[in-house]
Amino acid sequence: MERNPPDGTGPVHVPLGHIVASEKWRGSQLAQEMQGKVRLIFEEGLASADFYLSSKSCILYVTEADLVAGHGYRKRLARFRNSSHLQGIIIVEKTQMSEQYFPAVQKFTVLDLGMVLLPVASQSEASCLIIHLVQEQTREPSKNPFLRKKRSMLSELSLVQTVQQIPGVGKVKAPLLLQKFPSIQQLSNASVQELEEVVGPAAAQQIHTFFTQPKRQQPRS
Protein backbone atom coordinates (compact mmCIF):
# COMPACT_ATOMS: atom_id res chain seq x y z
CA MET A 1 0.00 0.00 0.00
CA GLU A 2 1.23 3.51 -0.81
CA ARG A 3 2.57 5.51 2.08
CA ASN A 4 0.30 8.23 3.29
CA PRO A 5 1.22 11.92 3.34
CA PRO A 6 2.56 13.11 6.71
CA ASP A 7 -0.20 15.66 7.27
CA GLY A 8 -2.96 13.08 6.87
CA THR A 9 -4.88 15.14 4.31
CA GLY A 10 -4.62 12.58 1.50
CA PRO A 11 -4.82 11.20 -1.01
CA VAL A 12 -4.53 7.76 0.58
CA HIS A 13 -4.59 4.52 -1.38
CA VAL A 14 -7.55 2.42 -0.19
CA PRO A 15 -8.12 -1.08 -1.62
CA LEU A 16 -11.68 -1.63 -2.89
CA GLY A 17 -13.99 -2.75 -0.08
CA HIS A 18 -11.55 -1.66 2.63
CA ILE A 19 -11.42 1.23 5.08
CA VAL A 20 -8.18 2.86 6.15
CA ALA A 21 -8.71 3.96 9.76
CA SER A 22 -6.69 6.11 12.11
CA GLU A 23 -4.80 4.03 14.67
CA LYS A 24 -6.63 5.86 17.48
CA TRP A 25 -9.83 3.95 16.59
CA ARG A 26 -8.28 0.52 17.14
CA GLY A 27 -10.28 -1.34 19.80
CA SER A 28 -13.14 1.18 19.78
CA GLN A 29 -16.80 0.17 19.63
CA LEU A 30 -17.04 1.76 16.20
CA ALA A 31 -14.15 -0.31 14.82
CA GLN A 32 -15.44 -3.50 16.45
CA GLU A 33 -18.89 -2.99 14.92
CA MET A 34 -17.36 -2.70 11.44
CA GLN A 35 -14.96 -5.64 11.66
CA GLY A 36 -16.24 -8.69 9.84
CA LYS A 37 -18.37 -6.53 7.54
CA VAL A 38 -15.55 -4.58 5.88
CA ARG A 39 -11.79 -4.93 6.09
CA LEU A 40 -10.14 -2.34 8.32
CA ILE A 41 -6.54 -1.23 7.87
CA PHE A 42 -5.22 0.84 10.79
CA GLU A 43 -2.54 3.43 10.12
CA GLU A 44 -0.63 6.01 12.12
CA GLY A 45 -0.36 9.59 10.95
CA LEU A 46 -3.89 10.26 9.73
CA ALA A 47 -3.93 13.67 11.36
CA SER A 48 -7.14 15.18 10.01
CA ALA A 49 -9.43 12.39 8.81
CA ASP A 50 -10.52 9.37 10.84
CA PHE A 51 -11.58 6.95 8.10
CA TYR A 52 -10.72 6.82 4.40
CA LEU A 53 -13.38 5.15 2.25
CA SER A 54 -11.45 5.60 -0.99
CA SER A 55 -8.60 7.66 -2.37
CA LYS A 56 -11.09 10.50 -2.89
CA SER A 57 -13.41 10.42 0.11
CA CYS A 58 -13.01 10.25 3.85
CA ILE A 59 -14.85 10.69 7.13
CA LEU A 60 -14.11 13.08 9.95
CA TYR A 61 -15.76 11.83 13.13
CA VAL A 62 -16.84 14.14 15.96
CA THR A 63 -17.66 12.26 19.15
CA GLU A 64 -20.01 13.17 21.96
CA ALA A 65 -16.95 13.94 24.10
CA ASP A 66 -15.54 16.26 21.40
CA LEU A 67 -18.74 18.32 21.38
CA VAL A 68 -19.05 18.54 25.15
CA ALA A 69 -15.37 19.48 25.56
CA GLY A 70 -15.75 22.68 23.54
CA HIS A 71 -14.55 24.07 20.22
CA GLY A 72 -11.35 22.03 19.83
CA TYR A 73 -12.82 19.92 17.03
CA ARG A 74 -13.31 23.02 14.88
CA LYS A 75 -9.59 23.51 14.25
CA ARG A 76 -9.29 19.98 12.90
CA LEU A 77 -12.30 20.37 10.59
CA ALA A 78 -11.17 23.77 9.34
CA ARG A 79 -7.61 22.52 8.77
CA PHE A 80 -8.95 19.64 6.69
CA ARG A 81 -11.25 21.92 4.70
CA ASN A 82 -8.45 24.35 3.92
CA SER A 83 -5.71 21.85 3.07
CA SER A 84 -7.41 18.80 1.57
CA HIS A 85 -8.83 18.15 -1.87
CA LEU A 86 -10.76 15.09 -0.69
CA GLN A 87 -14.51 14.78 -0.33
CA GLY A 88 -14.92 14.99 3.44
CA ILE A 89 -18.04 13.75 5.22
CA ILE A 90 -18.49 14.80 8.83
CA ILE A 91 -20.26 12.37 11.15
CA VAL A 92 -21.35 13.80 14.50
CA GLU A 93 -22.63 11.94 17.55
CA LYS A 94 -25.91 13.66 18.43
CA THR A 95 -26.83 12.13 21.78
CA GLN A 96 -28.92 13.25 24.73
CA MET A 97 -25.78 14.67 26.31
CA SER A 98 -24.43 16.44 23.21
CA GLU A 99 -27.74 17.54 21.65
CA GLN A 100 -27.49 21.07 23.05
CA TYR A 101 -24.18 21.57 21.24
CA PHE A 102 -25.39 20.20 17.90
CA PRO A 103 -26.79 23.45 16.40
CA ALA A 104 -23.37 25.09 16.81
CA VAL A 105 -21.46 22.31 15.03
CA GLN A 106 -24.19 22.13 12.38
CA LYS A 107 -23.93 25.83 11.70
CA PHE A 108 -20.12 25.71 11.61
CA THR A 109 -19.75 22.70 9.31
CA VAL A 110 -22.58 23.42 6.87
CA LEU A 111 -22.59 27.23 6.73
CA ASP A 112 -18.96 28.12 7.42
CA LEU A 113 -17.20 25.11 5.86
CA GLY A 114 -19.81 23.99 3.31
CA MET A 115 -19.30 20.31 4.14
CA VAL A 116 -21.67 17.33 4.36
CA LEU A 117 -22.84 16.67 7.93
CA LEU A 118 -24.57 13.46 9.04
CA PRO A 119 -25.75 13.08 12.67
CA VAL A 120 -25.82 9.65 14.33
CA ALA A 121 -27.17 8.58 17.72
CA SER A 122 -24.36 6.14 18.53
CA GLN A 123 -21.17 4.52 17.24
CA SER A 124 -23.24 1.48 16.34
CA GLU A 125 -25.40 3.60 14.04
CA ALA A 126 -22.28 5.26 12.65
CA SER A 127 -20.77 1.88 11.78
CA CYS A 128 -23.88 0.96 9.76
CA LEU A 129 -23.70 4.26 7.89
CA ILE A 130 -19.99 3.90 7.11
CA ILE A 131 -20.40 0.28 5.98
CA HIS A 132 -23.24 1.35 3.69
CA LEU A 133 -21.08 4.07 2.12
CA VAL A 134 -18.25 1.59 1.51
CA GLN A 135 -20.60 -1.00 0.02
CA GLU A 136 -22.05 1.57 -2.37
CA GLN A 137 -18.57 2.41 -3.62
CA THR A 138 -17.71 -1.29 -3.93
CA ARG A 139 -20.79 -2.02 -6.01
CA GLU A 140 -20.23 0.84 -8.41
CA PRO A 141 -16.97 1.35 -10.32
CA SER A 142 -15.60 4.90 -10.34
CA LYS A 143 -16.56 5.32 -13.99
CA ASN A 144 -20.20 4.52 -13.34
CA PRO A 145 -22.23 7.67 -14.17
CA PHE A 146 -24.70 6.82 -11.39
CA LEU A 147 -22.02 7.15 -8.69
CA ARG A 148 -22.17 10.91 -8.99
CA LYS A 149 -25.92 10.70 -8.43
CA LYS A 150 -25.34 8.65 -5.28
CA ARG A 151 -22.97 11.30 -3.94
CA SER A 152 -25.47 14.00 -4.87
CA MET A 153 -28.19 12.10 -2.99
CA LEU A 154 -25.94 11.93 0.07
CA SER A 155 -25.48 15.70 -0.04
CA GLU A 156 -29.23 16.20 -0.44
CA LEU A 157 -29.93 13.90 2.50
CA SER A 158 -27.49 15.86 4.63
CA LEU A 159 -29.12 19.12 3.54
CA VAL A 160 -32.61 17.91 4.48
CA GLN A 161 -31.38 16.61 7.85
CA THR A 162 -29.60 19.89 8.50
CA VAL A 163 -32.67 22.01 7.77
CA GLN A 164 -34.83 19.71 9.92
CA GLN A 165 -32.60 20.48 12.92
CA ILE A 166 -33.10 24.25 12.66
CA PRO A 167 -35.39 25.48 15.47
CA GLY A 168 -38.99 25.77 14.29
CA VAL A 169 -38.60 23.55 11.21
CA GLY A 170 -38.86 19.76 11.66
CA LYS A 171 -39.61 17.03 9.11
CA VAL A 172 -42.73 18.60 7.59
CA LYS A 173 -41.46 22.13 6.97
CA ALA A 174 -37.94 21.22 5.80
CA PRO A 175 -38.97 20.02 2.29
CA LEU A 176 -41.23 23.06 1.88
CA LEU A 177 -38.39 25.42 2.72
CA LEU A 178 -35.97 23.64 0.38
CA GLN A 179 -38.43 23.94 -2.50
CA LYS A 180 -38.19 27.73 -2.25
CA PHE A 181 -34.65 28.01 -0.86
CA PRO A 182 -32.61 25.14 -2.44
CA SER A 183 -29.43 25.83 -0.45
CA ILE A 184 -28.44 26.72 3.10
CA GLN A 185 -26.95 29.96 1.81
CA GLN A 186 -30.24 31.04 0.23
CA LEU A 187 -32.17 30.02 3.32
CA SER A 188 -29.82 31.94 5.61
CA ASN A 189 -30.23 35.09 3.50
CA ALA A 190 -34.03 34.91 3.37
CA SER A 191 -35.99 37.69 5.06
CA VAL A 192 -38.58 37.04 7.75
CA GLN A 193 -41.29 38.00 5.27
CA GLU A 194 -40.06 35.47 2.70
CA LEU A 195 -39.91 32.75 5.34
CA GLU A 196 -43.41 33.60 6.59
CA GLU A 197 -44.85 32.78 3.17
CA VAL A 198 -43.65 29.19 3.61
CA VAL A 199 -43.81 28.37 7.32
CA GLY A 200 -45.81 31.12 9.03
CA PRO A 201 -44.69 33.97 11.33
CA ALA A 202 -43.65 32.02 14.45
CA ALA A 203 -41.38 29.52 12.68
CA ALA A 204 -40.08 32.24 10.34
CA GLN A 205 -38.87 34.28 13.30
CA GLN A 206 -37.14 31.25 14.85
CA ILE A 207 -35.37 30.40 11.59
CA HIS A 208 -34.28 33.99 11.00
CA THR A 209 -32.96 34.26 14.56
CA PHE A 210 -31.00 31.00 14.15
CA PHE A 211 -29.10 32.38 11.16
CA THR A 212 -28.63 35.97 12.35
CA GLN A 213 -27.85 35.64 16.05
CA PRO A 214 -24.18 36.15 16.94
CA LYS A 215 -22.18 33.02 17.74
CA ARG A 216 -21.92 32.33 21.44
CA GLN A 217 -19.25 30.42 23.29
CA GLN A 218 -20.30 26.98 24.42
CA PRO A 219 -20.51 26.61 28.21
CA ARG A 220 -17.75 24.54 29.74
CA SER A 221 -18.75 21.17 31.12
From Swiss-Prot:
One of its GO terms (molecular function) is DNA binding. Pfam families: HHH_2 (PF12826), PND (PF17949). This is Fanconi anemia core complex-associated protein 24. Gene3D superfamilies: 3.40.50.10130, 5' to 3' exonuclease, C-terminal subdomain (1.10.150.20). The lineage of its organism: Eukaryota, Metazoa, Chordata, Craniata, Vertebrata. Plays a role in DNA repair through recruitment of the FA core complex to damaged DNA. Regulates FANCD2 monoubiquitination upon DNA damage. Induces chromosomal instability as well as hypersensitivity to DNA cross-linking agents, when repressed. Targets FANCM/FAAP24 complex to the DNA, preferentially to single strand DNA. It is found in: Nucleus. The C-terminal region is distantly related to RuvA domain 2, a DNA-binding domain. GO terms for cellular component: chromatin; FANCM-MHF complex; Fanconi anaemia nuclear complex; nucleoplasm. The keyword ATP-binding does not apply. PANTHER family: FANCONI ANEMIA CORE COMPLEX-ASSOCIATED PROTEIN 24. GO terms for biological process: interstrand cross-link repair. Belongs to the multisubunit FA complex composed of FANCA, FANCB, FANCC, FANCE, FANCF, FANCG, FANCL/PHF9, FANCM and FAAP24. Interacts with FANCM. Keywords: DNA damage, DNA repair, DNA-binding, Nucleus. InterPro entries: DisA/LigA_HHH (IPR041663), FAAP24 (IPR026985), PND (IPR040646), RuvA_2-like (IPR010994). The keyword Cell cycle does not apply.
